[in-house]
């Protein structure tokens, strides 16, 4: 049996790392695949469904990223999908969220012009205890982001489908409590995955409930129902500012109203990145679990979509 590896970037580094970490495995690197029926595991960010279909003995897909919607767009494959849960990526995303929330909490955007330097000195800005941060999505990454804000003194609100018992987090659950969650937060950080239940979650009605809060999206762009809804909400002051590391489509069309807006920041999906050196070790550990007859971690629930 073989493991097929399909790196989406830095192929030589992945080859070197897996060679060291999985010396006893028969590793093939796409597109080299002499016998598709011998492929038992795939390590990749994505592959065409038509190619996956040729691996008739495939049992596991080990994703090279935290998101897994790319594997489920045309229905979940029969193979078990294992997503990447890397603390380094969680820390990167927490740092990104803290950076941008602090940027607008402290009014730093007002100092970037000569006029903004008038009245040099201290400014009257809300303190962290006066600036609750809401986290949409309370998985591993959302929990790390919440802890980062708590360490700085921010009250943290959390929204998810089922709620949370995380220490110190004010929990909101389900559609009925989403409006209250938004109204209680002065910044909203989205880390929800792309699933059928999250697509279009934030529409014009929901943006009107932000109450001037800053919106930071580092989950998936599909949570926003419409670019026009978001831009209109920013123009109306319902959303104080928006920082978008993810959009739909990605990147936005050149004519998108998101570009050139003085209260909208776009970054190119860099809030959290797969770091080969740490990710390869986590993937190799899951290969070892599979070989030992144990369940890898974390396994995607095909019904939930994550």
Question: Could you tell me what each predicted segment is?
Answer:
Residues 40-113:
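Phosphate/diphosphate ligand-binding glycine-rich loop within oxidoreductases
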Residues 111-144:
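Glycine-rich NAD(P)-binding loop of Rossmann-like domains
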Residues 151-168:
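NAD(P)-binding Rossmann-fold cofactor-contacting core
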Residues 1-39:
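N-terminal glycine-/charge-rich "phosphate-binding" loop or analogous flexible N-terminal tail
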Residues 163-257:
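Rossmann-like adenosine-cofactor binding region
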Residues 27-38, 49-52, 168-184:
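Short acidic low-complexity segments
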Residues 78, 129-132, 212:
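Phosphate-coordination loops involved in phosphoryl transfer and adenosine-cofactor binding
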Residues 88-96, 110-111, 250-306:
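C-terminal helix-to-coil terminal segments
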